[in-house]
Amino acid sequence: MKRAICSGSFDPVTNGHIDLFERAGALFDEIIIAILINNKKKPLFPLAERERLLRESIAHIKNATIDSFDGLLVDYAREKEATAIVRGLRSNADFEYEKNIATMNKELAPQLDTLFLMTDPNYSYVSSSIVKEVASYSQDVSKLVPQPVAHALKEVYRR
């Protein structure tokens, strides 16, 4: 079975992420959407909320599961017996950053490949940071994120 991992903080998940998951799901037998727990960052949404929002947003992707991890992605990939890591690229800057990580991952886990998928041009400017910034000013982000996320952002910034 070909299993791939799509990892990130997903704080929050965006339509760009969903597009990546759908495309990865078409390429692999199974995809694991793995939420990275980074104790150095303070997320807007707690882990349980990010898991819920992801679950509601990817219900239509039948070969996707959601999990979380801390530590090195290559260690997690070995544990899950994944054959690939899938990363989305929005720009040349993303490529330079991701290429270095992929090279180190290959050094640590030679059996693990990294697959880069170019972001759909409709989402090339979308990031979780931009979404949070725009939502914090009570602006509509419903074209940038799944409906459950748009609702959750309204609730957070209503306070």
From Swiss-Prot:
Q: Which reaction does it catalyse?
A: (R)-4'-phosphopantetheine + ATP + H(+) = 3'-dephospho-CoA + diphosphate
The main enzyme category here is transferase
In which pathway is this protein known to take part? Cofactor biosynthesis; coenzyme A biosynthesis; CoA from (R)-pantothenate: step 4/5
InterPro entries for the chain: Cyt_trans-like (IPR004821), PPAT (IPR001980), Rossmann-like_a/b/a_fold (IPR014729)
The residues that hold ATP are S9, F10, H17, G88, L89, R90, E98, Y123, S124, Y125, V126, S127, S128, S129
Q: Where is this site: Transition state stabilizer?
A: H17
According to its UniProt entry, one GO biological process term is: coenzyme A biosynthetic process
Which cofactor does the UniProt annotation name?
A: Mg(2+)
Q: Which UniProt keywords apply?
A: ATP-binding, Coenzyme A biosynthesis, Cytoplasm, Magnesium, Nucleotide-binding, Nucleotidyltransferase, Transferase
Q: Where in the cell is it found?
A: Cytoplasm
E.C. number, please? Answer: 2.7.7.3
Q: Which residues cross the membrane?
A: none
Q: Which Pfam families match?
A: CTP_transf_like
Annotated Gene Ontology cellular components are: cytoplasm
Gene Ontology MF terms in the entry: ATP binding; pantetheine-phosphate adenylyltransferase activity
Which positions bind substrate? S9, K41, L73, R87
Q: Outline what the protein does.
A: Reversibly transfers an adenylyl group from ATP to 4'-phosphopantetheine, yielding dephospho-CoA (dPCoA) and pyrophosphate.
Subunit structure of this entry? Homohexamer.
Family classification: Belongs to the bacterial CoaD family.
Name of this protein: Phosphopantetheine adenylyltransferase
Q: Where is the organism placed in the taxonomic lineage, from the top? A: Bacteria, Bacillati, Bacillota, Bacilli, Bacillales
| Gene that produces this protein | coaD
